[in-house]
Amino acid sequence: IIASGVSLIWMFIAKGGYNYNYNFITILGFNLFPLFSWAIGLSIVQIIYLYYEPLFKNKHFSYKLLVFVTLYWPILIFVETVAYHIFHIQNLATAKYTGLIFCNCIHAPTWVQISYFLIGPIFFIICSIINFKSPYSKIYHQIKQTVNKYYSKDKL
């Protein structure tokens, strides 16, 4: 739900900036491809992060944000590169702009490129503010208790 909200807000900001070389469904002027791509992409990164989050549960917020960004940025670059170079999905509305040097992807104005890299951290901060809990924390805690019990019996 949070990822969908962030995606929808982004689409309000960049609404006219999406016009692809493929005919994706558009409703009320909103291209559904980037709307769903952002929501699904943010959700996937969040699921990966939440799986490992119990390992650094007691770490400072800035450490957790750094871990999230370390996941989000490479995934963003990978997906954008594959979409552009392999699937040839091109945004005609921003095709005149130079892509990022290291991947020749995200052909858009600089403010859009920066926004792409900031959307993930903003999403993470929103999730942190509303205190979104990992469904994996309880499972991790149970596994850790089981392992600790097993090893404590060996030491006796």
Label every PLM stretch briefly:
Residues 1-156:
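Aromatic-rich, lipid-facing transmembrane alpha helices and their immediate juxtamembrane interface loops
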